[in-house]
Amino acid sequence: MFLMVTGFMNYSQQTVRAARYIGQSFMITLSHANRLPVTIQYPYEKLITSERFRGRIHFEFDKCIACEVCVRVCPIDLPVVDWKLETNIRKKRLLNYSIDFGICIFCGNCIEYCPTNCLSMTEEYELSAYDRHELNYNQIALGRLPMSVIDDYTIRTIQIK
């Protein structure tokens, strides 16, 4: 008889505990009902990125002195800098500069340590391509400034607070 009573007590305690857990979960669900949806309809709506966002790298060919600091500070030795030594003026002349965004980890070390500030991060994050070789940007592709999301009238921008 005593075992039956203790078994019934355990069963009732477990039932009350389960009802409490279900009630707590339901209260959390109801608290989320008042919030606005966080889903963004991507091609038609885009987020305005913060000013510290690490997007595609922008390169200014005229400012670069081919010092290769960006290559030395890159954790994966990614930027490819081709230069030629001009013997008459004893300076390096930049021939080619390229970055493969299929490999880049967007750490920002190259931008931070560049002595001439010829590298900067843009707000562009749409770098998808059908072929991974299209992600290898030379100095001409790196020099193009992206179109601002705010200026595009076909897209509704959303500010996250």
Curated annotation (Swiss-Prot):
Co-factor binding comment: Binds 2 [4Fe-4S] clusters per subunit.
Gene (UniProt): ndhI
Protein name in the entry: NAD(P)H-quinone oxidoreductase subunit I, chloroplastic
Keywords, in A-Z order: 4Fe-4S, Chloroplast, Iron, Iron-sulfur, Membrane, Metal-binding, NAD, NADP, Plastid, Plastoquinone, Quinone, Repeat, Thylakoid, Translocase
Family in the record: Belongs to the complex I 23 kDa subunit family.
PROSITE patterns: 4FE4S_FER_1 (PS00198), 4FE4S_FER_2 (PS51379)
UniProt GO molecular function: 4 iron, 4 sulfur cluster binding; iron ion binding; NADH dehydrogenase (ubiquinone) activity; quinone binding
One Pfam family from the record: Fer4_7
Endpoints of the signal sequence: none
GO BP annotation list: photosynthesis, light reaction
GO CC annotation: chloroplast thylakoid membrane
Residue span, 4Fe-4S ferredoxin-type domain: 55-84, 95-124
Gene source species: Lotus japonicus
Uppermost EC category: translocase
Sites where the protein binds [4Fe-4S] cluster 1: C64, C67, C70, C114
InterPro entries per the UniProt record, alphabetical: 4Fe4S_Fe-S-bd, 4Fe4S_Fe_S_CS, NADH_quinone_OxRdtase_chainI, NDHI
Xref: Gene3D superfamilies: 3.30.70.3270
UniProt entry tagged with the keyword rRNA-binding: no
Membrane topology of the entry: Peripheral membrane protein
UniProt-listed Enzyme Commission number(s): 7.1.1.-
